[in-house]
Amino acid sequence: MKIAIYDIESTGAITEWSSIIEIGGVLIDENFNEIDRFNLRGRIPEGEIPQAKALLVNGTTIDQLTKSNLSNYMMLDQVERIFKKWSPAIFMGFSNINFDCEMIRKSFFRNLRYPYITNATPNKRHDALNIVRAAHAVDPKVLKTELNAKGNVSMKLESLSRLQGFDVSGAHTAQFDAINTFKILKLIKQKIKPNLWSSLLRTYSKADTETIFKKEKMITLVEYYYGKNKFHLCAPLHPKYCIHPVYQWGQAVDLRVDPVPLLNMSINELKVEMKKSPKFLRTIRSNKAPIILDAEQGMKFEPYNVMTSDLLNKRAELIRSNE
C-alpha cells in the first residue's frame, strides 16, 4: 500500500481555533520510491489572529500570511483533490495523530468537506513518531540520537534529521519536514528486519488493531511516557470483553502481575486495585496507531525475561479464558 507522508504548519497550537497556512507532502510506494509531492500555502482566514509563537516556529512572514495566491478555502480544495488522487494510502506524519490529523479534520469540517479523508476507507493512518520510538526501543542503534535537557533521548524531528546527516535548514516548513520524515522512515525500514517493519505498520486502523488483540493470546505493547519507551507483555481480556464499553479501546492485563488474586476480587476491590501503580490493566488506544509487537519481543525485557514461558502462558490463558 502506498504511504502518504504530510506535514502542516498552522497559525497556532490549539486545533479548534487555528488554521492551516502551509501543507506539504510526499507520496511513496511500498519500496520507498517517491511517486509524487506537493506544497501549498494559503492566506490566513479574515478576522483570525495568529499566535506569535507559532509564526516564530514556522518562520511565516506577515506577507506570506496575508498575500499568498491561495485563500484558505482554495488551498483546502487543492489538498482534498490531491489526497483523493493519492488514495488508497496510509496517511502519516511526524506526531500527526495528535495535531496534523486533527487540523485536517477540523479545517475540512469548517469548510464543509469530508473531515475523515485521511483515515476512512480506503485509506489508513499511522504516526511516524510512534514508529520511530518503537524502532529505537527495539534497537537503539537504528538511529543516531542525542539527549535532551531532561537527560532523555530526543525524538524531535529536527534533532533526528540533523544527526542522520539530513539537511535541516528548512525545518518547520511543511514539505521540508515531510521529506525528512520520509528519509528517517526509509532509514529505519532499511535497517530493521522486514517482519518488524510489518509489525510496526499493522495498527494503521482501528479495525486492524482490534483484530490483533482479539486473536492473539499475548502481545507486546510498546508505550512511551516520562520520556522513555516501556515494554508491556500483556494478555488481552476475553475476546467478548476486551473492548471498553464506553471508550471503545482495548483492554489487556500486564503479565508481570499474577492474575489469580484479581480474578477473585469483587468489583469494588478491582476499582481500588486499578488505581494503584504500576497499573496491571493496560489500555490499547485502538484508533491512535499503538505499537503492538509479537510476544517474543516483550520476553526479551525485564521483568518478563526472568519469568518462564510456562508461567507467562499460564497467566495469559487464565486472563484470556475468563469471562
Task: Indicate residue ranges for each PLM-predicted region.
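Sequence-level motif detector for i,i+2 pairs with an aromatic at +2
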Residues: M1-I3, I35, N123, E216, ...
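Acidic, Mg2+-coordinating catalytic module of metal-dependent nucleases/exonucleases
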Residues: I90-I97, M103, P140-A207
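Active-site-proximal helix-loop-helix substrate-binding element of RNase H-like nuclease domains
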Residues: I44-N58, I62-T66, N123-A178
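Acidic two-metal-ion nuclease catalytic site recognized across multiple nuclease folds
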Residues: K186-R315
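Short, glycine/acidic-enriched loop or turn micro-motifs at the edges of active sites
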Residues: S10-G12, N130, N180, V257
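Conserved non-catalytic scaffold segment of RNase H-like nuclease domains
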Residues: M1-R113, S154, R162-Q164, L263-E323
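Short mixed-charge
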Residues: Y114-P122
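Alpha-helix capping at helix-to-loop junctions
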Residues: K85-P88, F109-R113, I131-K141, F166, ...
